[in-house]
Design a protein with these regions (language model features):
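Thiol-/selenol-based redox modules, centered on thioredoxin-like
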Residues: 137, 142-220
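Short active-site neighborhood of thiol/selenol oxidoreductases, capturing the structured segment around
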Residues: 44-66, 72
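Alpha/beta-hydrolase fold active-site loops
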Residues: 52-53, 90, 138
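N-terminal "domain-start" segment that seeds a small globular fold
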Residues: 18-46, 168-169
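Bacterial Sec-dependent N-terminal signal peptides
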Residues: 1-24
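Short, internal strand/loop/helix patches
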Residues: 36, 93, 105-141, 145
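Conserved helix-turn-beta segment immediately C-terminal to the redox Cys motif
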Residues: 67-94
Length: 220
């Protein structure tokens, strides 16, 4: 019986190791990447553990990449400081397949890619591109705080839609937004000849008071 239990434990442990293997499929741990930034400082993907990270393969010479960059910038600006169920904050680890440093830096500046940018300037001969099975760009991988791949190749609005699914909703912020809308509606009605001091105003006033009380309780 004891040997049987030990075998079960070993099987479970082996299954855990298998499920957490390093690879490029959803559910795998993304392989580490260590490449220099434009200043020559080496940056490791694993140093960003704890955050939600988009591993983004692109190049300044890639037309589709440049067209996609505004969507990526918008997602970064919107979600950079958010808290997620799968990590704290959102950042981007941009890997360029450029071979000319000047063009790479120019692309970063023009497209306002204000996040981690790295490259070995090896074009399609980059070992990192090979490691991640990248055959075309743009190409990306979304990883959680533990480096596990949760999504791949998120283009256009799909990137924001995917990030939104993982956002931790702040109840206080939600109530405050609702309160702001109700107060605006109340002020508009209060100055309206059509409504004056109607039942609608009293109803709104009660709703405002209830929300203010809810916010106060949440902040305790």
């Amino acid at each position: 019986m004891k040997k049987f239990l030990i075998l079960i434990l070993i099987a479970h442990f082996a299954n855990f190791l298998f499920s957490q293997q390093v690879g490029i499929n959803i559910g795998d741990i993304a392989p580490d990447i260590k490449l220099p930034n434009p200043k020559g400082d080496s940056i490791s993907l694993y140093s960003l553990r704890g955050q939600v990270v988009l591993i983004d393969f692109w190049a300044s010479w890639c037309g589709p990449c440049r067209k996609e960059n505004p969507h990526v910038v918008q997602a970064y600006e919107k979600y950079h400081d958010k808290n997620f169920k799968i990590g704290k904050g959102f950042t981007i680890f941009g890997i360029s397949l450029d071979k000319n440093k000047e063009n790479w830096e120019k692309g970063i500046k023009e497209d306002k890619l204000n996040w981690y940018n790295v490259s070995d300037l090896s074009y399609w001969q980059s070992p990192v591109a090979s490691k991640y099975g990248v055959k075309g760009i743009p190409s990306n991988f979304l990883i959680d705080k533990d480096g596990i791949i949760v999504a791949k190749n998120l283009r256009g609005s799909v990137l924001e839609e995917t990030l939104e699914k993982y956002v931790v909703v702040d109840p206080v912020a939600s109530f405050e937004d609702e309160l702001k809308d109700l107060k605006l509606e109340y002020n508009n009605l209060e100055h309206s000849d059509e409504y004056g001091n109607s039942k609608e105003l009293k109803k709104l006033k009660k709703s405002i008071a209830n929300i203010e009380k809810s916010i106060e309780n949440l902040k305790k």
